[in-house]
Design a protein with these regions (language model features):
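Short, hydrophobic-biased segments on the C-terminal half of alpha helices
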Residues: 55-56
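N-terminal helix-turn-helix DNA-binding core of bacterial DNA-binding proteins
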Residues: 7-50, 69-72, 76-80
Length: 130
């Protein structure tokens, strides 16, 4: 696992943080043989235009590789995660996990502190009264 960042938020790459691209990268990370354009579109629930736009962004960042072939005289576009894309996506997921764990700990601590200040019937005790 990569070293913990002093500021894990800095490692949250906007390239992957956009929900549709996060879904696309997640789907591609499970597909060793890549996914066809139509399979990726269906998997992520995107339109042709929306998928094309996000594919262009990911391809420009060298996170994916697009292969165009013909099968039975029909064009087929297959999308693969690049080695650099896989590495970068793993680093992003590790940073995201670190941020989420920190947030979960903070929420739990606040909930615990709030719970200790509640009266049995659920009312909060005002500061200085409890």
């Amino acid at each position: 696992m990569a070293a913990k960042h002093e500021n894990p938020y800095a490692a949250l790459k906007t390239l992957f943080h956009e929900p549709n691209r996060l879904a696309m990268m997640s789907a591609l990370s499970q597909a060793i043989d890549g996914l066809t354009f139509n399979d990726l579109k269906r998997e992520c629930g995107l339109t042709d235009g929306n998928l094309s736009r996000h594919l262009k962004t990911l391809e420009e960042a060298e996170a994916i590789r697009i292969e165009k072939t013909f099968v039975d005289a029909k064009p087929r576009t297959t999308v693969f995660l690049s080695d650099a894309g896989r590495k970068s996506f793993i680093e992003y997921l590790q940073a995201l996990e670190e941020v989420l764990q920190k947030a979960a700990r903070s929420v739990a601590a606040v909930e615990k502190k709030s719970a200790s200040r509640r009266l049995p019937w659920g009312k909060l005790v005002k500061a200085g009264e409890g």
